[in-house]
Amino acid sequence: LVGTATKYSECLLAVKFRQVDEDGHVVGGPFNYIEHGMGPKWKWLAKIFAFFGIGVGLLGIGTFTQVNGISSAVNNFFDSNNAWTVSLFGRTYSWTVVISCLILTFCVALVLIGGIQRISKVAQVIVPFMAATYFLAGILIILFNITDVPAAILTIVQSAFGLKAAAGGALGAMVVAMQKGIARGIFSNEAGLGSAPIAAAAARTNEPVRQGLVSMTATFIDTIIICSITGIAIVLTGAYDMGLEGVAVTTKAFQLGLPFPDGVASFILMLCLVFFAFTTILGWDYYSERCLEYLTNGKKKCIKAYRWIYILCVFIGPYMTVSAVWTIADIFNGLMAIPNLIALVALNGVVAKETKDYLDRIKKKEID
């Protein structure tokens, strides 16, 4: 509920305070509503947001976590036992990781540098079908284990609030569990992070409230539906308690819970993750480029150089450990969210006024 309300507020503000740049493009986001909503004296806070927005794109959920997830999913399908390995940077990797890294980096470069948008458009068309496939797979696992669902939900609740911890450390366990939950929630739906408003600002609407309502539904679908199904499926199959991490946990849940051979389940998850992560990588390039444009006043040379750096980070991602990837992502997510959350608190009166005016106009039948 907090995430949904946060997404509503930030996307409403993004549309209200958006601007038109020199090229005639509509741009906006937290940096705009911080500067124009809170006032010019807060421009320093807008710049801090933009700076860390670039950091999240380059080193966080824009590249490292996505590429690491793709390479892990591909490796789980083609070489789960790491039979074909190569030594790089003092560590041993499966050849599938290296090959998938090269292919992904090449595809991202084609879109960002080569301007070949057909790849991204194909991915965007396929993603809804992949989302439906992922959703149905999760539902199947739940249906096949329907009698165990209440126990699984109880386990999730107990784990979420640290209720299984010893009495002496229960409070500390609860704090840690909630911290992890909030961090993963931000990664999942990006509510409060400040990325969604950058996309919402470009929406073709003159009603800030309407865009806020549309944007907040994404948080509900992603967190309440998709993530809940995934979590329940993982607990039902026992995959959460097998010493696995990252994509391997969900892969094992699909293998154990679906009535298909392990290879089929791994293939389904691999395809879903590849398309989800690829479109996310491209999306975060857009977000972080808007942040860079704000900091550099739209200098084209800076944008072109940035794209090469972004591609380099895509190439590096698969060779990092899962723990390192998530630690970096959590740090930058927090640093990016803080300026945005400060702005949301400061501008809550604007959100309330816009919402009231919109509802009054509906009552008067001035709008549909």
Region roles according to the model:
Residues Y8-R18, E22, I139-T155, L163-G169, ...:
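Extracellular/periplasmic helix-exit of transmembrane alpha-helices
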Residues L1, C11-L58, T250-L269, E293-C302:
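Transmembrane-helix boundary/entry motifs in multi-pass membrane transporters
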Residues V2-E10, C101-I116, V127-T147, A183-R184, ...:
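Selective recognition of specific alpha-helical transmembrane segments in multi-pass small-molecule
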Residues V26-V27, H36, P40-I48, N82-R91, ...:
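Membrane-interface alpha-helices at helix entry/exit sites of multi-pass transporters
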Residues G57-I70, N81-A83, V108-S120, L140-A152, ...:
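Transmembrane helix-loop junctions in multi-pass membrane proteins
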Residues F49, V67-V74, W95-V157, L292, ...:
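Membrane-interface loop-to-helix entry segments
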Residues A46-F51, F78-G114, A132-T133, S266-L271, ...:
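Transmembrane alpha-helical segments of multi-pass small-molecule transport proteins
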Residues L1-G24, L45, D222-I229, A265, ...:
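Extracellular loop-to-transmembrane helix junctions
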